Design a protein with these regions (language model features):
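Short amphipathic alpha-helix that is part of the acyltransferase structural core
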Residues: 1-68, 75-86, 153-195, 230-233
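Short hydrophobic/aromatic beta-strand element in the GNAT-like acyltransferase core
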Residues: 49-53, 63, 89, 210-214, ...
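A glycine-centered beta-loop-beta connector
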Residues: 55-59, 216-220, 370
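Conserved acetyl-CoA-binding loop-helix of GNAT-fold acetyltransferases
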Residues: 89-92, 98-113, 243-253
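Conserved GNAT acetyl-CoA-binding A-motif
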Residues: 112-125, 254-261
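Conserved active-site alpha-helix within GNAT-family acetyltransferase domains
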Residues: 115-119, 125-144, 270-271
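Amide-forming acyltransferase catalytic core, primarily the GNAT-like/NAT-type
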Residues: 142-244, 249-284, 289-291
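C-terminal functional modules
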Residues: 258-400
């Protein structure tokens, strides 16, 4: 193993059933997962993934999965569904760590997703410091709950939690209809809630000695809990209609939220195309800098309306993006307005672009004039940014 570099190892991209061949490496690295959960994952989900693996000879030493999810994205007053990738199972054998294995796999996966014009990808990091150098940034904070008086009692269909009953197969279409409608009313970005989604989720929670519990039944469903019993018991998700407490939910919100999901812009054009104007038409010229996916670099001409977005690259923008990357290296601000002399309105690093699209960056920060920029120009850009409808309400609560 000594002296072997990632570039000398064989890169493989298993798909379908071949992804299951990486189970031994998964178990070696994620040894804290229960056998029951691992069995579930490799029976129900692994074959749906696309794998990336480095082998030393025939031995897998580093891996990751791209797990496809149907993501609902608000587009004006409607939604579009895109298959996007959740990066999971990032694992390297201990003797091969800190040698660039993950770097090679992650960059290869990003390039493949870029080739498919995917707007973004997301993951749940074990350590956010690992992914920040690859321009990932947090976009979703998960609400925390405590369990009140109402432990899980009974078994099978008679299992209850407080005043809630465990979901049965007959409840699936009603739960899917309720959840999808709820998400569309409250969020701009979420995983599609349908019968296959809740069927898989029930199996996943059962693998963690938990389940799905309902407030109400059939077409009268008013809320649900996703509960996992492993360790101390955990409410993974709590959704209800109306005032909290009206349905006897045994989960109490603490008011705290924990950052759990990071995302990265993959294709800048596709990402910017998700935005809409709140009214009328708004034109912006945005300089983007990406140290990994160089096709994103340059000046993007954007015309946002209430119904769509036209985004195309200015071929003269490459030099501007290069100059911006040099300022980034000197710890200059990563999100700023351009001066009146520049050929663009706004400069965005990849983390700044991602944060801004998902409502994590304020318009005032975006339009902060620097380097002698005209104050009126900064205010003009700020007004434009305030007129753009971003995807501010994110609910990416899938935990792997």
């Amino acid at each position: 193993m000594d002296g072997i570099r990632p570039g000398q190892m064989k890169l493989g991209k298993p798909e379908g059933e071949d992804c299951k061949s990486l189970r031994a490496l998964w178990e070696e690295v994620f040894y804290g997962d229960s056998r029951k959960f691992t069995d579930y994952y490799f029976k129900e989900k692994a074959a749906l993934n696309r794998g990336y693996v480095l082998r030393d000879g025939e031995m897998p030493v580093s891996m990751l999965y791209l797990s496809p999810y149907p993501v609902m994205l608000r587009s004006g007053d409607t939604f579009a569904c895109r298959e996007l990738n959740y990066i999971v199972g990032v694992a390297t054998k201990e003797p091969y760590r800190h040698r660039g294995c993950m770097d090679r796999l992650l960059k290869e996966a990003l390039r493949d997703m870029y080739g498919k014009a995917q707007p973004f990808t997301f993951l749940m990091p074990a350590d956010c410091a690992i992914y920040r150098p690859y321009q990932f940034t947090y976009i979703y904070r998960r609400a925390e709950y405590t369990l009140g008086n109402g432990p899980v009692t009974g078994r099978g269909k008679t299992c209850t939690m407080g005043g809630m009953k465990k979901m049965g197969k007959e409840d699936l279409p009603f739960l899917a209809e309720f959840a999808q409608a709820y998400m569309e009313r409250h969020y701009d970005v979420f995983i599609r809630r349908d019968i296959p989604y809740f069927t898989r989720m029930e199996k996943e929670l059962q693998a963690q000695e938990g389940g799905i519990f309902l407030a109400g039944e059939k077409d009268g469903i008013k809320g649900y809990l996703l509960y996992a019993e492993e360790e101390q018991g955990e409410i993974q998700e709590a959704v209800w209609e109306g005032e909290y407490g009206a349905w006897g939910l045994p989960a109490h919100p603490t008011g705290q939220k924990t950052p759990v999901i990071m995302a990265r812009t993959v294709d800048a054009k596709a990402m910017l195309s998700l935005l809409r104007a709140k009214s009328g038409s708004i034109t912006l010229r945005i300089c983007v800098s990406d140290p990994v996916l160089h096709g994103n670099n340059g000046i993007w001409n954007c015309v946002f309306t209430e119904d769509g977005a036209e985004v195309y690259k200015d071929s003269a923008g490459t030099k501007a993006a290069k100059n911006y990357r040099e300022r980034e290296k000197k710890n200059a601000p990563v999100l700023m307005a351009a001066s009146a002399e520049r050929a663009y309105d706004l400069e965005l690093s990849i983390p700044a672009l991602t944060s801004w699209v998902f409502g994590c960056g304020q318009e005032e920060q975006c339009a902060c004039p620097v380097d002698g920029a005209d104050l009126d120009m900064g205010e003009k850009v700020r007004r434009k940014l305030c007129g753009i409808r971003r995807l501010e309400h994110v609910f990416l609560n899938e935990i792997v």
